[in-house]
């Protein structure tokens, strides 16, 4: 009898172990190959405007059966794989992919470089599909906006009183609609845009949107070719073009002494320096010239032959349409 009882207890113990093992296996399967995986980006709202030429990452999460939201890891992907899908705005995105970083998965979005005047709505999704048959068992949507911020409406009101419109580097775009507003404020007269170091006076009647992003980065090919000269650079990489000829005035008070009062102005375009006729105002310590197109301007204290090539790599390249990639800043 005792032997029978012992055998019975042993069988019960084995049965209990089998049940527990089965239960643990079932839990693992539920995590890795549930018919509906609840993928998400957590609390991400995608409210941030994505700037061109930058990379952004968004961690991926999964909601477990107990309602707990945890980072997506390899443990959740035993029987499924992750893929991405772009729906709208593909032209504004260079890459849209899922990467693993520190054992967790995240969506990595790299935007196309450039200087657009309009913002592009981008729609994409991250999907979980079964490895066995490709069936979609979960997805998370990403709605993004790519572009540059527009100048504030408050800044435009300066034109009402004939004052300068200040262009912030963080908000460089002026839209077609905003130009119409500016023109109305100015009664069709010229208006002046400035950043404090430069100012540009021009009529804007019927003007389409422009990107007035600017910088003072050196053109290394020029500086290295003429090492014994002083240089000042003022660049508008978006190559904003205006319908009317305007006057660009650049403050050179900081350079007046080093340059000895001598200023020669050039436009850098496709590896070549093109001479621009400019006027020096010694009293105001400014340099002015007429132009419809804002590009990459080079100021130096010694004359350089007009048409001098400083970057040979452009010589054999075909012409590029301005709307696809402004020539003002191609080599950066």
Positions of the model-derived regions?
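Extracellular/luminal low-complexity segments enriched in Ser/Thr/Pro
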Residues: 98-119
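A short beta-strand micro-motif common to beta-rich folds, especially ectodomain repeats
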Residues: 115-136
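Sec-dependent signal peptide cleavage junction
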Residues: 6, 15-32, 331-332
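Proteolytic-maturation and junctional protease-sensitive modules
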Residues: 241-298, 303-304
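Solvent-exposed, low-complexity, repeat-rich "mucin-like" stalks and linkers
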Residues: 24-84, 164-172
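Low-complexity "stalk/linker" and mucin-like segments enriched in Ser/Thr/Pro/Ala/Gly
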Residues: 73-103
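Intrinsically disordered, low-complexity repeat and linker tracts
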Residues: 149-195, 201, 293-295, 300-332
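Proteolytic processing hotspots in large secreted/extracellular or virion-associated proteins
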Residues: 144-175, 215-263, 269
């Amino acid at each position: 009898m005792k032997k029978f009882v012992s055998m019975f207890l042993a069988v019960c113990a084995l049965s209990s172990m089998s049940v527990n093992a089965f239960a643990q296996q079932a839990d693992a399967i539920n995590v890795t190959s549930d018919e509906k995986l609840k993928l998400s980006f957590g609390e991400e709202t995608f409210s941030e405007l994505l700037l061109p030429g930058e990379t952004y990452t968004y961690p991926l999460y999964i909601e477990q059966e107990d309602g707990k939201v945890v980072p997506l890891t390899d443990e959740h992907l035993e029987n499924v794989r992750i893929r991405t899908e772009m729906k709208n705005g593909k032209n504004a995105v260079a890459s849209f992919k899922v990467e693993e970083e520190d054992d967790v998965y995240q969506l990595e979005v790299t935007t196309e470089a450039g200087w657009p005047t309009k913002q592009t709505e981008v729609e994409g999704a991250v999907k979980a599909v079964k490895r066995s048959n490709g069936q979609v068992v979960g997805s998370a949507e990403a709605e993004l906006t790519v572009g540059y911020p527009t100048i504030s409406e408050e800044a435009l009101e300066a034109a009402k009183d004939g004052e300068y419109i200040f262009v912030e580097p963080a908000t460089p775009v002026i839209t077609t609609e905003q130009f119409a507003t500016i023109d109305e404020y100015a009664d069709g007269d010229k208006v002046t845009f400035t950043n404090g170091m430069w100012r540009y006076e021009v009529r804007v009647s019927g003007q389409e949107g422009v990107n007035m992003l600017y910088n003072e980065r050196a053109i290394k090919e020029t500086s290295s070719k003429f090492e014994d000269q002083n240089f000042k650079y003022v660049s508008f990489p978006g190559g904003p073009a205006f319908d009317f000829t305007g006057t660009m005035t650049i403050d050179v008070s900081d350079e007046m002494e080093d340059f000895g009062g001598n200023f020669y102005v050039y436009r850098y375009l496709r590896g070549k320096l093109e001479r621009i006729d400019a006027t020096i105002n010694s009293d105001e310590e400014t340099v002015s010239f007429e132009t419809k197109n804002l590009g990459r301007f080079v100021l130096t204290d010694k004359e350089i032959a007009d048409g001098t090539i400083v970057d040979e790599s452009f010589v054999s390249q075909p012409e590029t349409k301005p709307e696809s990639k402004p020539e003002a800043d191609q080599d950066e």
